[in-house]
Amino acid sequence: MSAAFVDADTARVKANAVKFIQLLDSIHMDELKKDTANIYAVAMGTFESIKSNAQSILTMTDIQEMRKDFSMVSENLYPFFKIINYEGEKMYWQNCPMAFGDEKEANWVSKTKEVMNPYLGKNHPEHKATMLHCGTVKDTIKAQ
């Protein structure tokens, strides 16, 4: 979804949210029951939050409101990957220190190390594209 947020393309954000929810629905969470009950319970709580925020994006029309739910998806996705011992392709946990104003930071998961800021993007009303690369890589998410 982050690339669609970079372009501030609400139709593409929603289309990607649908695909993301379908991907979530394909995850076999019951496999985690083989681990300790605590891992399953924590993972399920995080999973439900991710899905709920992704579904909320589908109900919105304002890109800034969508970005707030995207932020919540991201904030839950990162620990979810840690809980389930993610084994997929390398991804990056990135941060924008001014995603929602000078005092409000936000994070996201990216497939690329290069920062392409989904919160300020290419079409920000105030900054235009000048803040597209604003942010830092905070962590690398890779197979354990």
Give residue spans per PLM region.
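Mature extracytoplasmic or organellar-lumen-exposed domains after removal of signal/transit peptides
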Residues: 1-144
